UniProtKB/Swiss-Prot annotation:
Protein name in the entry: Centromere protein U
Entry-linked Pfam families: CENP-U (PF13097)
The keyword Coiled coil is assigned to this record: yes
Function: Probable component of a centromeric complex involved in assembly of kinetochore proteins, mitotic progression and chromosome segregation. Required for maintenance of sister chromatid adhesion during mitotic checkpoint activation.
Residues spanning the membrane: none
Entry keyword annotation includes Lyase: no
Organism: Gallus gallus (Chicken)
Motif Nuclear localization signal positions after renumbering to this chain: 222-239
Listed Low complexity bias regions: 142-152
Keywords from the named record: Centromere, Chromosome, Coiled coil, Nucleus
Biased composition (Basic residues): 1-10, 19-29
Biased composition (Basic and acidic residues): 88-106
Cellular localization per UniProt: Nucleus; Chromosome, Centromere
Length: 345
């Protein structure tokens, strides 16, 4: 059983590689010994569906091939595709794209438009030309749906704050991947395939969301770094200006400090003089009060009174000198007057 399963999986992988190498769905060319394409319309509907399903690519998904490779190989070896499986394959290969104007276009996953089965069998050439004509409409509609702000969902975690300006390619990829994965998951009937697809989708979404978070954190860090650099630059310029101003005002500061020291010294000396004068005035008032109370007592001068005696002696000496000067002037005036009188007589 294991060898049969391995051969079936290898056969399914080879067929998947052959279908993956094709960029657009082609028509099969039959060998000369097989019947012509024009005879296909006469065959039963089951054989027509088999030929049509073989002409389209398999879904390009690794999990779908690995998990469902056994079923694909069994169906291909038997040469018959059941109806539910055909409808699911057709449903998985279709994708709806809605433009901002409200038009809805239906495309297959391989990039071609699904035409009705009978038209595909009866007129294959016309179908191919219609596919080529309708292909630009898919690009324009997909571009408009991606570029339109309403079609892109912004993934915003709880820790980070994001705005419409922070939309990146990863957000677009994540939104489109979720849509495609949801459509593809609905088209699968097997539970194992659904689990595999869900696991792959969750892992891919986790990786993309981690990348989005890291990119947003990097942007925020760059913004903060730019702000810090700008603040440092401003503060550095301010520091240079302050240094220049300090160098210019330093001589003035030294001069003002000297003047302040002189003013403080004068102020302190003035305080001392005022205090000394107030004390001397109080002492003199006390002495006068004492002399009024005791007028008969002699004044006794002690060692502490020497400064006062010196001041008093200086005052007395000055008065004596003043009187001597007056006496000399009077004597000189008398002598002059006597000389004049003598000359007259």
């Amino acid at each position: 059983m294991s060898s049969k399963k391995r051969t079936k999986r290898n056969r399914a992988g080879d067929e998947y590689k052959e279908h993956k190498g094709r960029s657009h769905p082609r028509r099969k060319f039959l060998p000369p010994e097989e019947p012509d394409v024009s005879r296909i319309s006469k065959v039963a509907g089951v054989n027509q569906l088999e030929e049509l399903c073989d002409s389209f690519d398999q879904p390009l998904h690794s999990t779908a091939v690995d998990a469902c490779g056994e079923e694909h190989s069994e169906n291909e070896s038997s040469g018959y595709v059941p109806a539910p499986q055909r409808t699911n394959a057709e449903r998985s290969e279709k994708m709806l794209l809605e433009t901002p104007e409200g038009d809805v276009h239906e495309f297959s996953q391989s990039g071609s438009v699904r035409e009705p089965l009978m038209e595909n069998l009866n007129a294959p050439n016309t179908t191919r030309s219609e596919v080529k004509k309708k292909r630009p409409s898919k690009k324009s509609s997909s571009d408009s749906s991606v570029n339109s702000p309403s079609s892109v969902q912004l993934w915003c975690p709880n820790k980070l704050k994001r705005s419409s300006r922070d939309i990146t390619e990863l957000d677009v990829v994540l939104a489109e991947f979720e849509k495609i994965a949801a459509n593809y998951r609905q088209s699968i009937e097997s539970k194992a395939c659904r689990k595999a697809v869900s696991a792959f989708c969750s892992a891919f979404e986790d990786q993309v969301t981690d990348l989005i978070t890291e990119v947003q954190e990097l942007k925020n860090t760059k913004k903060k770094n730019a702000k810090v650099v700008a603040d440092i630059k401003k503060k550095r310029q301010r520091l240079m200006q302050v240094r220049e101003k300090l160098s210019r005002t330093e001589p003035q500061l030294i001069k003002l400090q000297k003047e302040y020291a002189e003013v403080e010294e004068r102020r302190s000396s003035l305080r001392q003089v005022v205090q000394f004068l107030t004390d001397l005035k109080e002492l003199q008032q006390d002495y006068l009060d004492y002399r009024e109370e005791n007028p008969r007592k002699k004044v006794v001068y002690g060692a502490s009174s020497l400064p006062a005696l010196l001041v008093e002696s200086r005052r007395i000496l000055q008065a004596e000198r003043h009187f001597q000067n007056i006496n000399r002037k009077l004597e000189y005036a008398l002598e002059v007057q006597r000389g004049k009188l003598a000359k007259e007589h």
